Design a protein with these regions (language model features):
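Acidic, surface-exposed loops and disordered segments
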Residues: 2-231
Length: 231
């Protein structure tokens, strides 16, 4: 009798897992070491999955080469409105763009009004009916100037800013294309731009139309050996 009582006490001190729903259950007893092993294995797997996910996100979000290969000039746009947060992201990369001596002479005019779009059509035929345009300019008074030559960094600084914008646009699912074929002086007159503001490029921006594809010419790239020469 005493032996049975002692056995019952030992059973009550152990964790028990029951299978089935009938009154007569089947007892499966797992030692503590086994349960700890299972628990730590599960935690390790979850941590590994989390780290792999983070690595995947970091790698794919920062793979500049893939982004450069995937981007192409878009010349057909839908009229879907661009979300404010995406516009802000484009402006943020424009703000972060490198400029000569960090003078930051960039000035961006955002064109969305229909009357202003009609003005653009007067100075260029390359508007592609985009819902929005970034007119990337530089302030000549703020740009870096060469000490001994009559040279300002406006063109280069503005081009760097524009490049960053079109790459970010593609990363956000938007499309863009660089337009430089416009009447500079006429554009300045129509938009009443100050004399010190130098228009660099016009960027149509928007969601590409469905099934928009890069032109065949986009894939024609010079061989690197024809582009590079070691001195």
């Amino acid at each position: 009798m005493s032996t049975n009582i002692e056995q019952l006490k030992e059973d009550s001190n152990e964790d028990e897992y029951y299978l089935g729903t009938s009154k007569k259950h089947h007892k499966i007893k797992y030692p503590t070491s086994y349960r700890v092993l299972v628990f730590t294995t599960i935690i390790s797997c979850l941590i590994s999955i989390f780290l792999l996910y983070k690595f995947y996100k970091i790698y794919n979000s920062s793979n500049f080469l893939n982004l450069s290969e995937a981007r192409f000039s878009v010349r057909e746009y839908s009229q879907k409105q661009i979300e404010p947060e995406k516009i802000n992201a484009l402006l943020r990369v424009a703000q972060l763009s490198p400029t000569a001596a960090n003078k930051q002479p960039q000035k961006i005019y955002i064109i969305t009004k229909e009357e202003d779009k009609q003005k653009l059509k007067i100075v260029t035929r390359y508007t592609f009916d985009a819902p929005m345009f970034f007119l990337v300019c530089c302030d000549k008074n703020k740009a870096w100037k060469h000490k001994t030559e009559d040279y300002y960094s406006t063109e280069i600084d503005g081009s760097i800013v524009a490049t960053n914008i079109i790459l970010e646009a593609h990363d956000l699912g938007l499309g863009s294309v660089i337009v430089r074929s416009f009447q500079t002086q006429k554009l300045k007159e129509l938009f009443k731009l100050p004399e010190n503001i130098v228009p660099i490029v016009l960027l149509p921006i928007g969601y590409p139309k469905e099934n928009t594809k890069p032109s065949e010419n986009h894939f024609k790239r010079k061989d690197i050996k024809d582009m590079v020469e070691y001195l």
